[in-house]
Amino acid sequence: MNIVINVDTPTFEQMKSTYQAPGTLPAGAAFHAKLKGVTVTGYTKSHKVMFQGALANQEAARWQPNDAPAPSRSTPAPAGLPAGFATWSVLGSDEVGVGSYFGPLTTAAVFVAADQVASLTQLGVADSKKLTDPEIIRLAKQIMATCPVTYLNLMPAAYNARMKKYNQAQLKALCHNYVLAKTLERLATKPQAILIDQFVSERTYFNYLQGQPQIVSHHVYFQTKGEQAHVAVAAASIVARYQSLKAMDTLSEQAGITLPIGAGHAVDLIAAKLIRKGLDLNQFAKVHFANTQKARQLARQ
């Protein structure tokens, strides 16, 4: 169970004295203590205090006056996930670049231990689509400095070669399996669960992996909008987007022009310019997209 309360400055300082303990503090925390049945973490800027564990409610009640509003509880786990899943130690994976013509297909996996969940949430780790590029860069660097991370940038030439053999969903499955397996190899303590941001059914996902030498299949859960189910998937989406941004900068430099995100008409115009410059779209873009034919038509005009 998670309980979060807001306290005034005198109470916060009193709690800081009560729960002060040796050891490294989570990012943004003023104090962090593991007691029997409960872990307590207080955050400096917000004066929010999180209680995690079976005795969270009882411990939080010590600091709440009788007429205070009820402390906020963590949201229930989404359907299909165990109760309390959001507080587990989880290895999460997500990908970006699927719908973008230029750039790589980037997949990342991030392991978040149970005692890191609160600090990453407090930092603002959330769905990467809701964050600005500067926020992505800041958060990704913090995630990569504190959590085990694996990412795979499947650059356009490599992506296009594999698309001759696989469909895009199968290629995504292979990439997720790869980054999950590589991260698991580095973990001294195995996660309580693995959460994949769902893009196909569980059955189809594992069918796509048949014949692979290593298949991650134990304690695996699938969830659409996985970043809302656990911060590990949100962290993975941020790392993936960060690495994708870096790759796009490199490709733009090679192309001599800023390559746009997405697959709209602006993309067609830039792709046509690359063709006119004599550059090979295979090195910059996912050429199976309809944008390729549109760009070729524009380049002939």
UniProtKB/Swiss-Prot annotation:
It catalyses: Endonucleolytic cleavage to 5'-phosphomonoester. It comes from the Bacteria. InterPro entries: RNase_HII/HIII, RNase_HII/HIII_dom, RNase_HIII, RNase_HIII_N, RNaseH-like_sf, RNaseH_sf, TBP_dom_sf. Its main location: cytoplasm. Manganese or magnesium. Binds 1 divalent metal ion per monomer in the absence of substrate. May bind a second metal ion after substrate binding. It is an enzyme of class 3 (hydrolase). Gene3D superfamilies: Ribonuclease H-like superfamily/Ribonuclease H, TATA-Binding Protein. Its EC number is 3.1.26.4. A divalent metal cation binds at D94, E95, D197. Endonuclease that specifically degrades the RNA of RNA-DNA hybrids. Belongs to the RNase HII family. RnhC subfamily. This is Ribonuclease HIII.
